[in-house]
């Protein structure tokens, strides 16, 4: 669902707008009310604002962005005059459908789970090779939404992105190990739980962040960074934490992660950077494909381990649900020490939502015991339902008006 995040509105940013100066008494007054006086030019025909990658402007403008980054500029309280009202062009019918399908993601997961358990033959055709292609396409679609500038933004936000990265690869793996040892899971099930806890952030986290009123741009950056880091962190942590339980082929895990995750992402970024006209055409269809593929990648693991789930699924629900719930909570409260509410929600969701599909694929390819893959299959359901439930809960809690902005464009 990485490509789906392209249609989700991110934080408003002003690209360019022109304002009639008839309501502005003087240049001095204008500069008093603007956060960026050096970027304002005044002429007889009006005030020109030209900003690139600037922070949101406040309190003079209320910004509202759509997928094509159209912006509405409105006069704020305390500034007199009549600024003509305008409204952004509405989403197309296709974009509305994609947004609806995306926000109903938990429903598709539930339906996919039921199909996987009771009619597994409908989804088990998506075996290892096809599963690999599907996951690779999702990584490619995420890359198609990124540019070199997005990686420069990571460098401008080292602390914010870094905390999310550490939460992803420190809090979650330790939680997975402690839960597996405390509940005394069998070696293959414990290994599977540790493996999925060491996987990078899931693409569905971008959608959950959008629903929760978090910072979608930051969510995409964190998912990207953890995805790139997975080539080293996932095999290294799995070997470190689960190596004493079962043999772990760290080199094989690294190679598979590189092939399935990193290569498609890099190809997508390069294509978007050097062939933007071509990718702009492709990107119109990738969201719909992303919705379908993500649903299949959630349903297929359930179908492939349906027999095991019917006999041992109950004993896995508690540890997997506990893993995600604890990650959501710890990620949020640690973030609250340094960041505002919006950023804390974003880091919490990133910490709690893993790429369970990647965990399932790695378990199938590199572990002989089929039980190792079962925790990842259960995680697909727990992660989607827990993350979306938390997002809906937060959506009904307003972000404080004085919430600090921790994200630098």
Swiss-Prot record:
One Pfam family in the UniProt entry: SBF
Gene Ontology MF terms in the entry: pyruvate transmembrane transporter activity
Effect of gene knockout: No visible phenotype under normal growth conditions, but plants show increased sensitivity to mevastatin, an inhibitor of cytosolic isopentenyl diphosphate biosynthesis. Chloroplasts isolated from mutant plants lack sodium-dependent pyruvate uptake activity.
Membrane association type: Multi-pass membrane protein
Transmembrane segments: 97-117, 128-148, 161-181, 185-205, 216-236, 250-270, 282-302, 314-334, 374-394
Gene Ontology biological process terms from the UniProt entry: plasma membrane pyruvate transport
Record keywords, A-Z: Acetylation, Chloroplast, Membrane, Plastid, Transit peptide, Transmembrane, Transmembrane helix, Transport
Positions carrying N-acetylalanine: 75
Gene Ontology cellular-component terms listed: chloroplast envelope; chloroplast thylakoid; membrane
Transit peptide feature range: 1-74
Domain of life assignment: Eukaryota
Subcellular location: Membrane; Plastid, Chloroplast envelope
Annotated tissue distribution: Expressed in developing leaves.
Family named by the database record: Belongs to the bile acid:sodium symporter (BASS) (TC 2.A.28) family.
Function: Sodium-coupled metabolite transporter that plays a crucial role in pyruvate transport across the chloroplast envelope. Is required for sodium-coupled pyruvate import into plastids.
NCBIfam families given in the database record: bass (TIGR00841)
Name of the protein: Sodium/pyruvate cotransporter BASS2, chloroplastic
């Amino acid at each position: 669902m990485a490509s789906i995040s392209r249609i989700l509105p991110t934080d408003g940013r002003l690209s360019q707008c022109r304002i009639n100066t008839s309501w502005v008494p003087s240049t001095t007054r204008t500069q008093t009310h603007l956060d960026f006086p050096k970027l304002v030019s005044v002429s007889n025909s009006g005030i020109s604002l030209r900003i690139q990658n600037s922070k949101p402007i406040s309190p003079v403008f209320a910004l509202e962005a759509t997928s094509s980054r159209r912006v509405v500029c409105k006069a704020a309280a305390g500034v007199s005059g009549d600024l003509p009202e305008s409204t952004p062009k509405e989403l197309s019918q296709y974009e509305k459908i994609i947004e609806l399908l995306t926000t109903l993601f938990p429903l598709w997961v539930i339906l996919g789970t039921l199909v996987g358990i009771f009619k597994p033959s409908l989804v088990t055709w998506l075996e290892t090779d096809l599963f690999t292609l599907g996951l690779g396409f999702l990584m490619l679609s995420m890359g198609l939404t990124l540019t070199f500038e997005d990686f420069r933004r990571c460098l401008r936000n080292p602390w914010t992105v870094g905390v999310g990265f550490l939460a992803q690869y420190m809090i979650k793996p330790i939680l997975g190990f402690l839960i597996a040892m405390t509940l005394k899971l069998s070696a293959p099930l414990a290994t599977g739980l540790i493996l999925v806890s060491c996987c990078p952030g899931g693409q569905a986290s971008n959608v959950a962040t959008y629903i929760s009123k978090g910072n979608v741009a930051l969510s995409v950056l964190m998912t990207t960074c953890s995805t790139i880091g997975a080539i080293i962190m996932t095999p290294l942590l799995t070997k470190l934490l689960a190596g004493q339980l079962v043999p772990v082929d760290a080199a094989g895990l690294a190679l598979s992660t590189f092939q399935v995750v990193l290569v498609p992402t890099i190809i997508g970024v390069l294509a978007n950077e050097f062939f933007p006209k071509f990718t702009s055409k492709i990107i119109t269809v990738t969201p719909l494909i992303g919705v379908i593929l993500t649903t299949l990648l959630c349903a297929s693991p359930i179908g492939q381990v349906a027999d095991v789930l019917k006999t041992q699924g109950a004993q896995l629900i508690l540890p997997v649900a506990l893993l995600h719930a604890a990650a959501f909570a710890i990620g949020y409260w640690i973030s609250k020490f340094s960041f505002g509410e919006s950023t804390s929600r974003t880091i919490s969701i990133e910490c709690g939502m893993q790429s369970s599909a990647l965990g399932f694929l790695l378990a199938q390819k590199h572990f002989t015991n089929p039980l190792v893959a079962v925790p990842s299959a259960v995680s697909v359901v727990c992660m989607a339902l827990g993350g979306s439930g938390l997002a809906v809960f937060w959506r009904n809690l307003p972000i404080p008006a004085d919430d600090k902005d921790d994200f630098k464009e």
